[in-house]
A protein has these predicted regions:
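Positively charged, amphipathic and often flexible ligand-engagement surfaces
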Residues: 1-253
Length: 253
């Protein structure tokens, strides 16, 4: 239908090295299988699924193996951002692995105060960024508590990214933020081919199709795997409003 795809094998915060190794091998298998099937689907990984909560070096090794496999197939790995307890370590591992920007990119959350500085540093290194609002329940000491401030931060970071000349991803279902990105791109002669929008598979399907018809590049984020229940309950516990968002937009789809 013209959509691009990113696959996310559900799972995070593993406590055993064997679990982290299994997750790494699962991603290598996914990349192998995608190549066999001729599918250019990207993959998204959480570093705590690869052992970050156990040992930073373990996560580095596993991410390096996955990136090497992706490079072999000219594929792409997106490193997800998790709770703020892992933000610095996630950035450190991403930089340590130092995969080329056509092989790996990272996620930045607009609700964190620190994100302006993080984006500035990442852009200097040429990193490809996926911008999200952020879904974890964080204290006001480190994150904007009000939606309007999160949105303002999102727009500010989005403009920095679009102006960089690097291919980035704008991940949101908020039509106002999508429109802001498109308006900024038009005003600054940035082609729709130079960035993409990312949306969850099955959520706001009419919006996804409308964006395609407008000539935008649209990638669907597809979580899958057996760990869905734990993932769902954890997200719900962290931010109950997530459930309302999901239900509201399922009906709007």
């Amino acid at each position: 239908q013209g959509f691009m795809v990113t696959l996310d094998l559900l799972g995070e915060s593993v406590q055993q090295a064997a679990e982290a190794e299994a997750a790494c091998q699962a991603y290598v298998h996914i990349l192998d299988r995608l190549a066999v099937e001729g599918l250019n689907y990207h993959v998204s990984v959480k570093l705590t699924q690869l052992g970050l909560a156990i040992d930073e070096g373990l996560a580095c090794r596993h991410l390096g193996l996955i990136c090497a496999c992706a490079a072999k197939y000219h594929n792409f790995v997106r490193v997800d951002m998790e709770g703020s307890a892992f933000t610095e370590a996630t950035l450190r591992v991403f930089r340590t692995v130092s995969a080329p920007r056509n092989v790996a990119g990272i996620v930045i959350q607009s609700y964190l105060y620190r994100s302006d500085k993080d984006v500035e540093e990442l852009l200097k290194s040429g990193a490809r960024i996926r911008l999200v609002k952020g879904a974890y329940d964080e204290p006001r000491e480190i994150a904007y508590p009000r939606k309007r401030d999160v949105d303002r931060s999102f727009v500010r970071l989005m403009e920095m990214m679009l102006s960089s000349g690097i291919y980035h991803a704008i991940a949101t279902h908020d039509e106002r933020l999508i429109a802001a990105a498109q308006e900024y791109a038009r005003a600054h002669d940035i082609s729709p081919d130079d960035y993409e929008f990312q949306l969850l598979y099955g959520i706001r399907r009419h919006l996804q199709r409308d964006l395609l018809r407008q000539g935008a590049r649209v990638r669907l984020y597809v979580p899958y795997g057996r760990q869905w229940y734990a993932y769902f309950m954890r997200r719900l516990a962290e931010r109950p409003a997530n459930l309302l968002f999901l239900l509201r937009n399922l009906f709007r789809a």
